[in-house]
Amino acid sequence: MREIGILGGTFDPPHLGHLLIAEEVRRAKELDEIWFIPTNTPPHKEDTTTSADHRTSMIQLAIDSHPSFKLNDMELKREGKSYTYDTIQELTDLYPSHTFYFIIGGDMVEFLPKWHRIDELLEMITFIGVSRPGYSLQTSYPVDFVDIPTIQLSSTILRERLQNREWIRYLLPDSVMQYVREHQLYGFGRN
């Protein structure tokens, strides 16, 4: 039996905050792997600004050097909204001997009551919550919390900084920054 942490998100772009969360949860919970699952269209957000191909390429570059980090693009292959319930149902069907843990930030903890089929989902997985500045970790739902170093970092902030040609070194893996430059993503590198 393998124990797998699931880190879902748009990863637009993937940044060091994502990697820090993944590694700290993996270590604290002694998980075998962390699977990064980019969403197609999350129910709580509008469409992403960057294509799925670019996002998966950037994730792969970001996680390449870590033997316990894997990319799983199953949600990108589905049409429409990406619901966690559908993803976990598919994963448990494909990997019945695995135990899955779904990693969420403090920003998502407070929305658990609104999640699609939350009661059924709670029977299938364990949620692992990590703190995020400005959000409460208080919930009546069963969530295992992992205390990790927090940084005020989001993909939204990084996209804005890239568009404004502001300094972002040390916030993105170098390989991802190189990819952003080469493909002129987020307005970076355009005249």
From Swiss-Prot:
Class of this enzyme: transferase
Catalysed reaction, written as an equation: nicotinate beta-D-ribonucleotide + ATP + H(+) = deamido-NAD(+) + diphosphate
Keywords from the named record: ATP-binding, NAD, Nucleotide-binding, Nucleotidyltransferase, Pyridine nucleotide biosynthesis, Transferase
GO terms assigned for molecular function: ATP binding; nicotinate-nucleotide adenylyltransferase activity
The protein, known as: Probable nicotinate-nucleotide adenylyltransferase
Transmembrane regions: none
Role, per record: Catalyzes the reversible adenylation of nicotinate mononucleotide (NaMN) to nicotinic acid adenine dinucleotide (NaAD).
InterPro entries found in the cross-reference section: Cyt_trans-like (IPR004821), NadD/NMNAT (IPR005248), Rossmann-like_a/b/a_fold (IPR014729)
Family membership noted in the UniProt record: Belongs to the NadD family.
Gene responsible for this protein: nadD
Enzyme Commission number(s) from the entry: 2.7.7.18
Gene3D superfamilies, per database record: HUPs
The protein's annotated pathway: Cofactor biosynthesis; NAD(+) biosynthesis; deamido-NAD(+) from nicotinate D-ribonucleotide: step 1/1
Top-level taxonomic group: Bacteria
UniProt cross-references to PANTHER family, sorted A to Z: NICOTINATE-NUCLEOTIDE ADENYLYLTRANSFERASE-RELATED, PHOSPHOPANTETHEINE ADENYLYLTRANSFERASE
Disulfide bond residue pairs: none
GO biological process, one term: NAD biosynthetic process
Listed CDD domains: NMNAT
Organism annotation: Oceanobacillus iheyensis (strain DSM 14371 / CIP 107618 / JCM 11309 / KCTC 3954 / HTE831)
Keyword Nucleus: no
